[in-house]
Amino acid sequence: MFSNCRSLKSLPDISKWNTSNVVNMGNMFNGCTLLASLPNISNWKTNNVQSMECMFQDCYSLSSLPDINKWNIDKVYNMENICKECKDTLNIPEKFKIIKKSIEY
């Protein structure tokens, strides 16, 4: 979606986006190196998402995440590198540190 938007510093209000049918959120903000904050996306419906791989990877300027603890990640099988190269102070909910794996045929 916004992958590799290296000059992107802020986003419009994307909190009301209908994400209920989204299956892949992988790389959504990957490479947005100047993005300093995100709108409140805590109410996004993520019950159908299967991949969040590299979602926030290389977001060097991102200092905090919205409260994504509300997200339903029951179907997510790939969270590899979800916050790779982000600041150590980024508050990542514990449940997002578990990588679920699945075999695809």
Regions found by a protein language model. Name each.
Residues 1-105:
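Negatively charged
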